[in-house]
Regions:
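Short loop/turn positions at the edges of beta-strands in beta-sheet-rich folds
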Residues: 20, 138-140
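Polysaccharide-binding surfaces and accessory modules of carbohydrate-active proteins
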Residues: 1-107, 130, 157, 161-208
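Substrate-binding groove/exosite segments of carbohydrate-active enzymes
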Residues: 7, 110-133, 140, 144-147, ...
Length: 256
């Protein structure tokens, strides 16, 4: 369905396999920088949540008003309970931050940085990390799940006469955290729908060159090249520059 297909989310299932003959302790981790409001960054908060069924890092901005096109939120959550995290690098000289991270995390599998909520200074962007720990017997495999969600609820028409309006996702959700929670609560349904679509599409009688042409371009639907207007109407650029869309108007020579 179109609503679930429009979820601003990425799901990472990471499978770890112990190929040794000894028990292994390991941690798989993701890092996320709070770049909300880019290029006007800073005064953004990183905080930890634990709601029993899931836990993780939530990022918000205090610099931008809720009706600003630079307002938004991000969330990095997991349903796994044996975790380690930090909301920024440890306090140290800037050129030592990543080296210290790899020294400590690479040795212990634990993050040693700050655990309490942080608001970064203006024009800075703190980097948080979430790790999921595992202990594997010889030959054992486990899968750990990360859910990364984002929400930028306001669309800016910055060419010609400027206007700002709600994106469709902005009318459906109040935060990236709520998006991630919906995904975690409905994971079996969402995965089932996705696999059903993929299996149906690739088992069809369409010529192989049609299957290739359609499937190879399908990921564009998950990029800033497209958006949905307030009422859900689909809107697409011809393509994307680094910081803007290219050729507005859902042009018919590209979108047919």
């Amino acid at each position: 369905n179109d609503d679930d297909s429009s979820l601003p989310v990425a799901i990472f299932d990471v499978t770890l396999t112990n190929v040794t003959e000894k028990k292994v302790k390991t941690t798989v981790a993701l890092g996320l920088q709070n770049i909300l409001g880019l290029p006007e960054i800073g005064k953004s908060e990183n905080r930890w949540i634990d709601k029993g069924s899931h836990r993780g890092i939530v990022m918000t901005t205090q610099r931008h008003d809720q009706d600003s096109p630079r307002f938004g939120s991000m969330a990095l959550l997991t349903p796994n309970d044996d975790v380690t995290y930090q909301l920024n690098f440890e306090e140290t000289h800037w050129f030592r931050a990543t080296e210290s991270l790899m020294d400590e995390f690479g040795t212990t599998g634990e993050f040693m940085g700050p655990k309490d909520s942080l608001v970064c200074p203006e024009n800075q962007a703190y980097v948080a990390h979430l790790g999921i720990k595992a202990e594997l017997a010889p030959g054992e495999s486990v899968t750990k799940t990360f859910v990364l969600a984002w929400l930028t609820p306001n669309f800016e028409k910055y060419w010609g006469e400027r206007h700002v309006w709600k994106t469709y996702q902005g009318t459906k959700w109040d935060s990236a955290e709520s998006v991630a929670e919906y995904v975690l609560e409905n994971m079996p349904k969402l995965e089932g729908q996705t696999r059903k679509f993929a299996n149906t599409f690739f088992s069809s009688t369409l010529p192989t060159y049609v299957l290739d042409a359609v499937s190879s371009q399908m990921s564009i639907l998950r990029t800033p090249t497209v958006t949905r207007l307030t009422d859900g109407t689909f809107y697409g650029w011809e393509g994307c520059h680094i910081n803007s869309g290219c050729c507005e108007g859902t042009c018919t020579h590209v979108w047919t």
